[in-house]
Amino acid sequence: MESCTRSSLQQLVAADSKSSNFCFRNLSQSSNNNVSYASSSNRNFVPQNVLNNEYQSFQHSSTSQPSVLRQGKNAFLKPSQLSFNMNSSEISNTHWARDFNILTSNFASSSVTSAPTQSSHISNFTNSQKYFANDLPNSLTDQPLAQPSASQRSTWLPCSAAVSTSSPSSDPFFDSYLEQAFEKAERLANEQQKISKVEKTFGTLDSIGTEQDDCFDPDYSNLPLFPQENASPPLFRKASCNSGFTTKC
């Protein structure tokens, strides 16, 4: 497992070079410059409900239709899932083939079902490094986009072993964004641990309030699991006599 970012963020974003994974980075589509990552090698690297989908993982099914591949902005693709069966006109009008460099050392001719005739449009596919590509186009039309500028290309970051995982990113915003995201994920994980401990002691939310015992007051059955902020003393939905949390026993 190798990290697409600094070593401190390995748990958040990772790519498995052995399975020829791509990491796609998007800094261009959204007005607030959100960064999106996808990695099927570690699909649950962040809980699904974290960060309001700021991080998402995609697994694209095999297809030979470029229009299908273009449907998912920031979609995750592997060489075995990229197959081309296009004529020259389709190649020249294909957004991601001509206008975006999707580079990997593992992309070989064996992955191509029908070799394109305009090889110049896909020459970058055989580059020796993997890269974060700006984005896969949102549109399903075949209207070509402008070639990326030099400044756009300079924002693409290598994602392979060619880059040390301990070296700092060249993009301060990118660093800051991931640091904040990592902190959010860490806080959520801590909260989830707390919830798990409570559920282990008192039962799950579905089971709370279903058992009748000396400490359970039916009038409390609709109270939240955690103390009400303004309650005095704090009221809990259910508590054990030996837990120290109850105000009734």
UniProtKB/Swiss-Prot annotation:
Keyword Nucleus part of the UniProt annotation: yes
Origin: domain of life: Eukaryota
First-listed, main subcellular location of the protein, grouped into a coarse class: cytoplasm
Subcellular localization, as worded in the UniProt entry: Cytoplasm; Nucleus
Record bears the keyword Nucleus: yes
Keyword line: Cytoplasm, Nucleus
One GO CC term, this protein: cytosol
Protein name: Uncharacterized protein C1A4.04
Species of the source: Schizosaccharomyces pombe (strain 972 / ATCC 24843) (Fission yeast)
